[in-house]
Curated annotation (Swiss-Prot):
Belongs to the protease inhibitor I3 (leguminous Kunitz-type inhibitor) family. The lineage of its organism: Eukaryota, Viridiplantae, Streptophyta, Embryophyta, Tracheophyta. It comes from the Eukaryota. It catalyses: Preferential cleavage: Arg-|-Xaa, Lys-|-Xaa. It comes from Cassia leiandra. InterPro entries: Kunitz_inhibitor_STI-like_sf. Keywords: Hydrolase, Protease inhibitor, Serine protease inhibitor. SUPFAM superfamilies: STI-like (SSF50386). Stable in the pH range 2.2-10.0. This is Trypsin inhibitor. One of its GO terms (molecular function) is serine-type endopeptidase activity. Monomer. Its EC number is 3.4.21.4. Disulfide bonds: none annotated. Stable at temperatures up to 70 degrees Celsius. Incubation at temperatures above 70 degrees Celsius steadily decreases inhibitory activity.
Amino acid sequence: SVELDSDGEPIRNGGGLYYILPVVQGKGGGLEFAKTGSQS
């Protein structure tokens, strides 16, 4: 499935990992991007 940002646009991060945090946690949630070294 395609994940969308807050503007409704597809999230693009070059094939790295991302984590979705719930809004009730921390500073309001968000995404964390990380490269894995195994992108294709």
